[in-house]
Amino acid sequence: MKPAILPVLTLVPSGARVSSRPLKEHGHLARMSNILSLVLASFLLVPLSAGRAPAAAPHLIHLDPASPGRVFEGIGAVSAGASTRLLPDYPEPQRSQILDYLFKPKFGAGFQHLKVEIGSGENSTCGSEPSHAVTREELANPRPRGYELWLMAEARKRNPGVVLDCLPWAYPHWVGDRFSQDSAEWFVAFLQVARKRYGLELDWISAAQNEMGTDLNWIRKDLRPALDARGFAKVKLQAPDDDSEYWQIFDSLEKNRDLDRLIGAVGYHYVDGREPWQIDQKAGRDATEKARRSGKPLWASEEWSQSGGRWGDKGALYLARLMNKLYTRDRITKFEIWCPIDSIYDQIIWGDTGAMQADTPWCGHYTVWPAVWAIAHTTQFAEPGWVYLDNACGQLDPTTWRGSHAALRDPKTGDWSVIIVTGERGRVQIRVGSGLKDGPVHVWKSTEAEQFAQQPSVGLRNGSIELELEPDAVYTFTSTTGQQKGSHGKPPPRKPFPLPFADDFESYRPGDSPRYFSDQKGTFEVCRWPGGGQCLAQIVPAQGILWYGNWLLKPHTLFGDPEWRDCTIEADVLLAGGDVEIGGRYADRNKLGYRWILTRDGRWQLNWQYTVLAGGQIADFNPGAWHHLRLEMKGDRISGFTDGKKLATVTDKSRAKGMAFLASTYDRNLFDDVRVGPLPAEDEAKP
């Protein structure tokens, strides 16, 4: 009896002829390899003749249901740092379409976990997110400010099983200390407003300050008792959510079993390192033996932070490699990326970061990036509760993580999936053990040319398939069905920010954040003023407990287009204290542009960034009245007006361009009737 010969599968161009003769000569194999390298988007999976002599033994992936393995907890995203700011401003149906790509199961990325920032009113990376309790008095009736609660509700609407989590970056000033009884009450109030206003029950709290560690005694004495006393006993705690002192928390947990019982999972950021973002770098952050032995779930609670618009380099392919690597090497069972979506203005720091892009709500344009489909190669084929098969997780080449594989099974049904990321071209044999589904194998593939393309299904022969895989690709082989490359069709075309622009804030509810305004520090929200109309107020009364150093201008909010140069910016202002300003040609947080400043005692100043260009005092200034500010920028000539009177004109050679902004000290200063209008360029204005 002849031994059984496994079918060899390879990818050939659609319509190409496949010889049935045995391939005996290396030259012939080389020519066939050249043909294979021409594969782009159109190909078939074709079994070659059983007479082929293998060039090398295939890499074996044996799916043994008896293999040890940890429970898969999901692939998630961290909406924080104001990275999601522009998403809620999208019109329908585009806003719902974007949310489908992010959270709808078996449609797009299908994120299975969502962690959001507990806002503070202080900068947390790409801007500031508002707090549910700006003052201690608001603890009694916390406010549903911002968009993170809305985002969690939209995620759960699409996937009732999505795991919800939260974490602060900074704190309002009244908390006093980041690990205090007041801060514990502030955490609890966030859960209360989520429950009261959106009907949300969160699953986890990251009991820490983002990347600043935690205090286990605070968790024991303040946070856990506060949660239990107010009806949140089921909420679990993860710590330390840090990006330093990797895995050292286990030294403390090992010594104190009471503390150990309080921590449901341990999470760290950038376990594989940050810059230079190389998949084979040795950052020295691998999970320790003590961490792995503990049996406690290990999380990569923030990872990647790159642009999903690229396939190679540090983009989607790198992300797929990293997801496989961190389980195989570290036994990390939950992987969360920052951020789910690039929904910030381009020139804000960390713009172009995320799984997809939606940063032009005024026209409804968005882009589904390749990273969505790299994530889908795991999330559409394995649910939380599936179990990894450790013996089937590994490297294709022991010298590099460019090629790897991770295998999982459903303990209830016997379904299985294998996610393979390749570096070089190579051959792989998947052997399916007894007790796992042995029906047809469904194949999905992503390359730079085309992502998430379903391939012809393949039948097992003697429990195995043997495959030749393309380089720099992602494959999923699975017994499951129901996946799809979801699509809502082509979105509207991209357009620049509208000019002229005006907002009188009358179309909002009090407490709303107005469309297209991106707070960078402080909180600007719509409010009613004593005259009965609505306006924009800066509501944070004092600087909070900062995340990192205070590198920013006073509280300010951005809007507009980075290409604006020759234009007027104007607003009505009412000062409660300190000063206010309007500005233009803001390029980034280190290039503030031109600033027209008015103080409550009537002093005015025209600045280029932090340099004073002109200044003076308004006679008989009425601090209790509304005043009209206007900044005119035309070529090199910059002029400032107050109440219709030109107070300064300077000639400045910076030739900068950029966005508009409003700014205020930490006072409840008001803005209304904000307008931006075009001016003819300097040469166009000449007769």
Predicted regions and their residues:
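Carbohydrate-binding surface patches
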Residues: 380, 391-439
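Secretory/extracellular carbohydrate-interaction modules
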Residues: 540-605
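Aromatic/acidic polysaccharide-binding cleft in carbohydrate-active enzymes
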Residues: 300-382, 387-398
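C-terminal beta-sandwich/jelly-roll accessory domains of carbohydrate-active enzymes
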Residues: 420-523, 528, 545-547, 612-614, ...
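Short tryptophan-centered beta-strand motifs in secreted/extracellular beta-sheet-rich domains
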Residues: 505, 569-571, 626-634, 638-640
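Active-site neighborhood of glycoside hydrolase catalytic domains
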Residues: 183-204, 211-306
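Flexible glycan-contacting loops in extracellular carbohydrate-active proteins
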Residues: 647-676
